[in-house]
Amino acid sequence: MPLVVVCGLPSSGKSRRTEELRRALTGEGRSVYVVDDASVLGAQDSTVYGDSAGEKALRAALRAAVERRLSRQDVVILDSMNYIKGFRYELYCLARAVRTPLCLVYCIRPGWPSRGLPVPGACESSDPAVSVSWRPRADYGEKTQAVGAVEQRAISPLANGGVPTAVPKELDPKDILPSNPPAVMTPESEKSAEPAPCAFPPELLESLALRFEAPDSRNRWDRPLFTVVGLEEPLPLAEIRSALFENRAPPPHQSTQSQPLASGSFLHQLDQATSQVLTAVMEAQKSAVPGDLLTLPGTTEHLRFTRPLTLAELSRLRRQFISYTKMHPNNENLPQLANMFLQYLNQSLH
């Protein structure tokens, strides 16, 4: 059955969307398997994305887990960032080899950096009630500028040459400006939501955002593409069902189709048949003149004789024919190996 690839930056709602889709499909009586980072990482944490070797091993483990589960009977959901388009192409080839459909669900959090095509609603300010494990540096800059403006207004009369007003002996505590900038206030929802032990460090989040390769529906391995912005936007379940269960699977091609199995004696018979043709050609050309059609025993094809052929030239063409035939073995061609070799000689000799 189909493969669903969930894509997006950390804390963009991928796991929640995965669980929502899993419940919807299991409610219809379908078998659904979820492959995520937690089932592969084990005791490691999310900092594995900061190590190129560890991240490469993680992608290999995710690909192997998907390949084990992928079949024509079960739905497999891959819940991971999947931010490298080359890795998404590998998943596309896996689905194509099994002849099962594939779709991509791209989760975007409003206000987070996006390097792909512009998505409506993705540049809106994020909801402060939703807790995150990091805070953009711009938030601190705006608050620091606001504090500096208050201090500048407090000393502006003195800076413009004005006369300071008399200060009463007893000042109201509310009128006294603090010497240090006020601390950034955190909403109660953010105070109560503690980051998970495997929270992504800010530097790692910035690095992931920079090297994130957003999916593009113009690429065949990224379509059909369903983009979901935020957690309030409903998941297009009807469109996803149509893409998974009503669309035709991509047709296999040579890179994803298994080669036909050859018998154990195929190479031996190939070597024997071409060797016999080579010996017969060398013998027949002794009494032939240019323009004759050489008839060889055990073949129905004819070889047009145009000039004397050397054994070295025929041996080179024989090696080329054997190398090509070994790449495409087929037991059905065993009786026609000699005729195929003669056809190859007619096309190669000038």
Curated annotation (Swiss-Prot):
Region ranges (Disordered): 161-196
Pfam families cross-referenced by the UniProt entry: KTI12
Modified-residue entries (N6-acetyllysine), positions: 143
The organism's place on the tree of life at top rank: Eukaryota
InterPro entries: KTI12/PSTK, P-loop_NTPase
Molecular-function GO term, any one: ATP binding
Positions bound to ATP: 8-15
Keywords attached to this entry: Acetylation, ATP-binding, Nucleotide-binding, Phosphoprotein
Modified residues annotated as Phosphoserine in this record: 156
A Gene Ontology biological process term: tRNA wobble uridine modification
PANTHER family, alphabetized: PTHR12435
Family, as annotated: Belongs to the KTI12 family.
Protein name, UniProt field: Protein KTI12 homolog
